[in-house]
Curated annotation (Swiss-Prot):
Amino acids binding a divalent metal cation: 51, 59, 61, 110
Chain positions covered by the region annotation Disordered: 237-264
One term of GO molecular function: nucleotidyltransferase activity
Coiled coil spans: none
The entry's keywords: Activator, Covalent protein-DNA linkage, DNA replication, DNA-binding, Endonuclease, G1/S host cell cycle checkpoint dysregulation by virus, Host cytoplasm, Host nucleus, Host-virus interaction, Hydrolase, Metal-binding, Modulation of host cell cycle by virus, Nuclease, Nucleotide-binding, Nucleotidyltransferase, Repressor, Transferase
Cofactor(s) the record lists: Mg(2+); Mn(2+)
Keyword Hydrolase on entry: yes
Subunit-structure text: Homooligomer. Interacts (via LXCXE domain) with host retinoblastoma-related protein 1 (RBR1), and may thereby deregulate the host cell cycle. Part of the C- and V-complexes which are RepA-Rep-DNA complexes involved in the c-sense and v-sense transcription.
Organism field: Wheat dwarf virus (isolate Sweden)
GO BP: any one term: symbiont-mediated perturbation of host cell cycle G1/S transition checkpoint
Residues in CRESS-DNA virus Rep endonuclease domain copies: 10-123
Protein name as it appears in the record: Replication-associated protein A
Length: 264
């Protein structure tokens, strides 16, 4: 019994590259058989080429181009049998042909006669876009888009498969390219509401900018009479300075020191 953790076989592509090792089938017979097996995918072109190893044993290469994308989940789906010997089964290695041009050049590189080659249909010269082409397309999208919506729309049109499986990544990129505008801060309380009103102004002058006799005695441990005198002096002093008394600019000249022995 196969392990449940074994990877599931699947080939999903319009273009298939098949290799039948040690295959003695005629290329034309293999081609006709594959046309029947792949009929539902509407084949456009099939090339079957027989190649001989150095020891003389043959193997068969086949390139198939379909109109519809083939979904092959059974590795034995394209097995071929001989009419004369139904027990002779030829099992292929099945791959997606990423570049049909290169595959066709590879399988026909050393064909020595038409007997070893069979072709049907019209070859479609297609190839998968390279990484450089995809990078250039993405760069053009980034530079030309002007909003998140336009960026995501262009990515969806150019890279539909990537867009369907990596939408969150593209949305993150869109937010990075076109961030939300910074909101202007509006204070909850306007500056005008912070101005002291008359009631608060009176309380402020009475409690914050004045010293009661009891507080002064408590802080300085001064007798009541002395504390009262100190507070009256501080009040008078503060009032005189608030009244704008100009500071004195006169200064007494120091007397010259009298040296010993000098008379009057």
């Amino acid at each position: 019994m196969a392990s449940s953790s074994a990877p599931r076989f699947r080939v999903y592509s319009k273009y298939l590259f098949l290799t039948y090792p040690e295959c003695t089938l005629e290329p034309q017979y293999a081609l006709d058989s594959l046309r029947t097996l792949l009929n539902k995918y509407e084949p456009l072109y099939i090339a079957a080429v027989r190649e001989l190893h150095e020891d003389g044993s043959p193997h068969l290469h086949v390139l198939v181009q379909n109109k519809l994308r083939a979904s092959i989940t059974n590795p034995n789906a394209l097995n071929l049998r001989m009419d004369t010997s139904p027990f002779s089964i030829f099992h292929p290695n099945i791959q997606a042909a990423k570049d049909c041009n290169q595959v066709r050049d590879y399988i026909t590189k050393e064909v020595d006669s038409d007997v070893n080659t069979a072709e049907w249909g019209t070859f479609v010269a297609v190839s998968t876009p390279g990484r450089k082409d995809r990078d250039a397309d993405m760069k053009q999208i980034i530079e030309s888009s002007s909003s998140r919506e336009e960026f995501l729309s262009m990515v969806c049109n150019r890279f539909p498969f990537e867009w369907s499986i990596r939408l969150k990544d593209f949305e993150y990129t869109a937010r990075h390219l076109f961030p939300d505008p910074v909101a202007t801060y509006t204070p909850e309380f306007p500056t005008e509401s912070l101005i002291c009103h008359e009631t608060i102004e009176s309380w402020k002058n009475e409690h914050l900018y004045s010293v009661s006799l009891e507080s002064y005695i408590l802080c300085t441990s001064t007798p009541a009479d002395q504390a009262q005198s100190d507070l009256e002096w501080m009040d008078d002093y503060s009032r005189s300075h608030r009244g704008g008394i100009s500071p004195s600019t006169s200064a007494g000249q120091p007397e010259q020191e009298r040296l010993p022995g000098q008379g009057l």
